[in-house]
Amino acid sequence: DIAALLQPDYYYHAIRNDAGGLVGFCCFGEDAQVPGGDYGLPALDVGLGLHPDLIGTGLSHGFLAAILAFGEEKFAPEFFRATVAVINRRSLHLFERAGFYVVQNFLSGEVRQHRFYVLLRAVAPEERFDPDMPAPAHRQ
């Protein structure tokens, strides 16, 4: 819903390159949650979307790193949390490489249900995201 993205009291942010072109967006807090998940533990929820033309270009790791750095500076959380559709393999791989791990899964949707993973990561200086780190072992 475009109207929701434009609400000033929501935590959506456009991300632009140096030339002013749209790279993607991010959101924080309840705006990044999916109905049906258990969000009882204190953590900063993070959602993102990379411009479709930029997917697969190698920008996603830096994109996520910048979003996490912004979220850490603005909100000072102890943990980051992300909710990702199980079918979104690229996004799951991105978050896992950034040190997130799956803590739950659930179904969401009234008409057509989709399974989601909730992933968590501690915010700690010694655990900063390194885009050159090796990918974790593949999840079964």
Feature names for model-found ranges:
Residues L120-Q140:
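Conserved N-terminal entry element of GNAT/NAT acetyltransferase domains
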Residues D1-D53, F70, A122-V123, H138:
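Acetyl-CoA-dependent GNAT
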Residues L54, G58-I67:
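Conserved acetyl-CoA pyrophosphate-binding loop and the N-cap/start of the following alpha-helix
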Residues H61, V86-Q104:
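Conserved active-site alpha-helix within GNAT-family acetyltransferase domains
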Residues E73-V84:
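Conserved GNAT acetyl-CoA-binding A-motif
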Residues Y10, Q113-L120:
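Short hydrophobic/aromatic beta-strand or adjacent loop that forms the aromatic wall/cage
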Residues T83, G99-F116:
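Conserved catalytic-core motifs of GNAT/GCN5-like acyltransferases
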Residues D45, F79, R90:
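Amphipathic alpha-helical recognition patches that constitute DNA-binding helices
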